[in-house]
Amino acid sequence: MADLAGAYADARRRLGELLAGLDEAALATPVPACPAWTVRDVLAHVTGVAADAAGGTYFAGAADAWSDVRLAAARDEWTAGQVRTRRQRPVEALVAEWAGLAATLEPMLAGAVPPPPGSPAWLRSAPVADLAVHLHDVRGALGRPGDRDAPATALGLRIYARWLGQRLDQGGRPALRLRAGDQEWVEGTGSPAASLAADPFELFRALSGRRSLDQVRALAWDGDPEPYLDLLAPYPLPPSPLAE
């Protein structure tokens, strides 16, 4: 895969620079893509993800939470705990903690050091994809779109697309052809029964659960979208449309 460590470091820098100039009111802005979280809470979460990935405490059931309500509840409690334990800390302290963790995590993402024993095979890609998603969640909450050309955004699309293919196989669904700009590929096994075309950023947001069902249905489908709608994202789709 492409430079996971470089993409993560770049996205970490981008989010850090975005947050650096925010006052307390802006940090308390609700994030529509992450109900019950504020901008500050998202920073606490991505810092917690770095801590768990580097420390060997990443929730291993996350990959299967899409198909198991108990795992989904456990995943939600895991991420809530990351936020809860850091909620009262100043942003400067969170950024400093994140930077310290990155000194361990980024060499691991680069493959220079092994992940902690017992880590899931997908651990190297997950923090990058998660950070890419939340970078745009925060931008959307603040009304400051941007970073669509960030390396993590492009990698996030590919990672979430690969996870979609795994869900399609596990769910016994037909393969799906994806078109993102001038890129085209198939996820799943066998001949695709439909295709989905979108701008790369829009496809990334759809596959990462940041588009409502109506928004997903309105995308450029060729073929019946129904067999794919409940598996397109690994999380419940938002009830209302999201703009970013």
Residue ranges: model-predicted function:
Residues 12, 19-26, 46, 50-57, ...:
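Short amphipathic alpha-helical segments enriched in hydrophobics
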Residues 9-12, 98-106, 128-131:
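Hydrophobic faces of stable alpha-helices that mediate helix-helix packing
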Residues 17-20, 106-112, 177:
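Acidic-glycine-rich active-site phosphate/pyrophosphate-binding loop
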Residues 14, 41-52, 104, 130-137:
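Alpha-helical scaffold segments in carbohydrate-active enzymes
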Residues 1-6, 29-30, 35, 58-69, ...:
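Structured surface interface patches that mediate subunit assembly and partner/cofactor docking
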Residues 1-44, 55:
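An N-terminal domain-cap segment
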Residues 1-3, 51-111:
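Short, helix-capping/interhelical loops that line the mouth of catalytic, cofactor-
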